Amino acid sequence: QYARLLGAEGDYSGARAQFAILLELEPNNPDMISTAALLDFELELYDAALAKFLQLIALEARLDEAFYYVGRIQAADDRYSEAIEAFGSVGPSREFRDAKVRAAQVLIDTAFASDIRQFFDAQRRTYPSSAEQLFLLEAESLRDWSGESLEAYDRGLAAFPQSFSLLYGRAMIHESEGSLWAMEQDLRRILAQDPNHAATLNALGYSLTNRTQRYEEAAVLIERALALSPGDPAIMDSLGWVYYKLGQYVQSESLLREAHAALPDPEVAAHLGEVLWAQGREVEAKDVWQEGLNRVSDHPIILEAIDRLGVALP
């Protein structure tokens, strides 16, 4: 108990010393080995941590945790094939998702998109009950290669045609590629199953606002989303933005100020600044934009707005 208390209070070195004593008494106790290994990992004593996690594997105890940390240590040591094998050995558990994401990242850094598919194909054969999640992780890991990512979403949806997460993810890829019709079709497939899916209502409404002039339709969608998720700053931002497009500046400013107070995100700042600018309140607009750029100096939405409006910031 004393050793665990030291660890809980952040005294990892003291806790490690206490667990070393305890392990001399019970050298094959999985709980003690696990805690001692995690302490070593926190203290960046990776060789010692690796030895303990490998001991857990030999004891066939806490396997998912052990394989996960073995993979992390080996990846940091540039032992990529061993890291991928370790991450691949993590079964459904709290470490499952992050292990597969880390394996994909190793493959992205060292191999090709085809290797990522092979890895996830093998994972789906090994863990068929997690196949839907694995399709999603594969597609997300390939997002910088939109063609390969779309292909992974397509394969996933062929197996799980009603999957909200796969439909939503594919819709966002379509949106980023400018394929508005395809994006809208996927989002409406979700809404056909669940008309009250607030995130999808908001995503569709916001995309229609930015990509079309269907502002009234967009406003109806986003208003429904906000009614379902009152106080959500992202949805308030979307609604404020479509109200701006409709020329309803007072309502727009009120929503955007509330959203900005709750979520001081540069994209919200871009929208609020533009609404203020449209009302002739140029100093206030510049202050809001500058605040956003202080957070993210090269934020594309703010930079696009001030360039389009011909604004010079101090």
What is the meaning of each model-derived region?
Residues 4, 29, 38, 63, 72, 96, 105, 130-131, ...:
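Residue-level recognition of tetratricopeptide repeat
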Residues 21-22, 55-56, 89-90, 122-123, ...:
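Canonical positions in the second alpha-helix
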Residues 25, 59, 90-94, 125-127, ...:
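Structural marker of alpha-solenoid helical repeat scaffolds
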Residues 1, 35, 69, 102-103, ...:
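Canonical tetratricopeptide repeat
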Residues 8, 42-43, 76-77, 109-110, ...:
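Register position in tetratricopeptide repeats
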Residues 32, 66, 99-100, 132-134, ...:
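TPR alpha-solenoid repeat register
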